[in-house]
UniProtKB/Swiss-Prot annotation:
Transmembrane regions: 69-93, 134-155, 178-200, 255-275, 291-312, 447-471
Name of the encoding gene: psbC
Co-factor remark: Binds multiple chlorophylls and provides some of the ligands for the Ca-4Mn-5O cluster of the oxygen-evolving complex. It may also provide a ligand for a Cl- that is required for oxygen evolution. PSII binds additional chlorophylls, carotenoids and specific lipids.
Residues with PTM Phosphothreonine: 15
tRNA processing keyword on record: no
InterPro entries for this protein: PS_antenna-like (IPR000932), PS_II_antenna-like_sf (IPR036001), PSII_PsbC (IPR005869), PSII_PsbC_sf (IPR044900)
GO cellular component: chloroplast thylakoid membrane; photosystem II
Role noted for this protein: One of the components of the core complex of photosystem II (PSII). It binds chlorophyll and helps catalyze the primary light-induced photochemical processes of PSII. PSII is a light-driven water:plastoquinone oxidoreductase, using light energy to abstract electrons from H(2)O, generating O(2) and a proton gradient subsequently used for ATP formation.
Name listed for the protein in its UniProt record: Photosystem II CP43 reaction center protein
Family (UniProt): Belongs to the PsbB/PsbC family. PsbC subfamily.
Subcellular location: Plastid, Chloroplast thylakoid membrane
Length: 473
């Protein structure tokens, strides 16, 4: 749909200093936006906006493929992934590719294949992006009405929403298919110290799955982040996939109800703000998930969680001092509490000392030593296995601590130690990105609401310094 009049009165007017710099349909006069305002120039050019989005997808997939191959090229099988600064290979390993018992990498070829497939995909997307940005039709409405749209068309917008939901649902089911039929996924809780296995006994009980949503986010409750078995994770993806696909079909077949038409602002910038809010929330949830959860993010690949490293330290010194003759059940610490063991607020036996705050921790290397009332004193005296000692010593020395300059370890560490856990990187980056996306949501939501209310006039530029400068050329 060609616009026959200038859109300047509808947008902030950004003044272009060099008025001669113009590309057809993307200049200051026809769009009201200068070149540096990016995709805002394409608000009413659906064909060109398609090009921008496809090219953006190509950049994302190119990064994934290139970084994947970079990590494969630098990978050392003898060292754990988390010691090598890897953030992509742990995700592939969690999906069960190339992994044997105990999280050991037995084959790096699947990782290479993944990188190459992403690079090839990015080339296809890159070509499509360049084609639609430079050659394809400026608008899709005339030639391809199915792909065309007008931002104000509420029915079309919810149809597009429905298509997106169906694609998301299919993505959730891809994980289900991988876990149930195509080789399984890595389960850190598998007997004998973690292994790749097919998840056959899915949790489909809605009481269990939706019970996570009703839990408190604090302490030992932990909301959805507290999921601690693969059956619940894969079963949850069955539910999510089904809900997304059903919701997508619903949004395609129905028109928005009157209350929805009144409640929402129906403009491109409003949709941008809704998307930013959603992705901000996902960023915050991902931050908590990767920091606290050692089932979806196994410690074999991502390193221990903070609580896990702390509890591992207490366990390591309990083992050492017990060998030296200490009675760990009755030894008293400097505060009068138990030095090695104490009781939690609810009566369970837990590790004593500073790590008492992490008494909720569950980890595959520690659970065998628990009884009905917390840690079992008899098991601690007789049943500790060498693999548990090795695992806890390893995790104790790889706590997810680190600073901005990538010099890792605790403050007392020697300078030779340069270790920053992928958990630190992934949780910090997702928190920061989630925060920025939230600010962007507020910004664009405010602009969209102001524009809809009719008082979006832009900034008065009469006294702007640039007007009093000599031209660059």
């Amino acid at each position: 749909m060609k616009t026959l009049y200038s859109l300047r009165r509808f947008y902030h007017v950004e003044t272009l200093f060099n008025g001669n710099l113009a590309v057809s349909g993307r200049d200051q006069e026809t769009t009201g936006f200068a070149w540096w305002a990016g995709n805002a120039r394409l608000i009413n050019l659906s064909g060109k906006l398609l090009g921008a989005h496809v090219a953006h997808a190509g950049l994302i997939v190119f990064w994934a493929g290139a970084m994947n191959l970079f990590e494969v090229a630098h990978f050392v099988p003898e060292k754990p992934m988390y010691e090598q600064g890897l953030i992509l290979l742990p995700h592939l390993a969690t999906l069960g590719w190339g992994i044997g018992p105990g999280g050991e990498v037995v084959d790096t070829f699947p990782y290479f294949v993944s990188g190459v497939l992403h690079l090839i995909s990015s080339a296809v997307l890159g070509f499509g992006g360049v084609y639609h940005a430079l050659i394809g039709p400026e608008t899709l409405e005339e030639s391809f009405p199915f792909f065309g749209y007008v931002w104000k068309d509420k029915n079309k917008m919810t149809t597009i929403l429905g298509i997106h939901l169906i694609i998301l649902g299919l993505g959730a089911f891809l994980l289900v298919f991988k876990a149930v039929w195509f080789g399984g996924v890595y389960d850190t809780w598998a007997p004998g110290g973690g292994d790749v296995r097919k998840i056959t006994n899915l949790t489909l009980n809605p009481g269990v799955i939706f019970g996570y949503l009703l839990k408190s986010p604090f302490g030992g409750e932990g909301w959805i982040v507290s999921v601690d078995n693969m059956e619940d994770i894969i079963g949850g993806h069955v539910w999510l996939g089904a809900i997304c696909i059903f919701g997508g079909i619903w949004h395609i077949l129905t028109k928005p109800f009157a209350w929805a038409r009144r409640a929402f602002i129906w403009s491109g910038e409003a949709y941008l703000s809704y998307s930013l809010a959603a992705i901000s929330m996902m960023g915050f949830i991902a931050c908590c998930f990767v920091w606290f959860n050692n089932t979806a993010y196994p410690s074999e690949f991502y390193g221990p969680t903070g609580p896990e490293a702390s509890q591992a330290q207490a366990f390591t010194f309990l083992v050492r001092d017990q060998r030296l003759g200490a009675n760990v059940g009755s030894a008293q610490g400097p505060t009068g509490l138990g030095k090695y063991l104490m009781r939690s607020p609810t009566g369970e036996i837990i590790f004593g000392g500073e790590t008492m705050r992490f008494w909720d921790l569950r980890a595959p290397w520690l659970e065998p030593l628990r009884g009905p009332n917390g840690l079992d004193l008899a098991k601690l005296k007789k049943d500790i296995q060498p693999w548990q000692e090795r695992r806890s010593a390893e995790y104790m020395t790889h706590a997810p601590l680190g600073s901005l300059n990538s010099v890792g370890g605790v403050a007392t560490e020697i300078n030779a130690v340069n270790y920053v856990s992928p958990r630190s990187w992934l949780s910090t980056s997702h928190f920061v990105l989630g925060f920025f996306f939230f600010i962007a949501h507020l910004w664009h939501a405010g602009r969209a609401r102001a524009a809809a209310a009719g008082f979006e006039k832009g900034i008065d530029r009469e006294t702007e310094p640039v007007f009093f400068m000599n031209p660059l050329n």
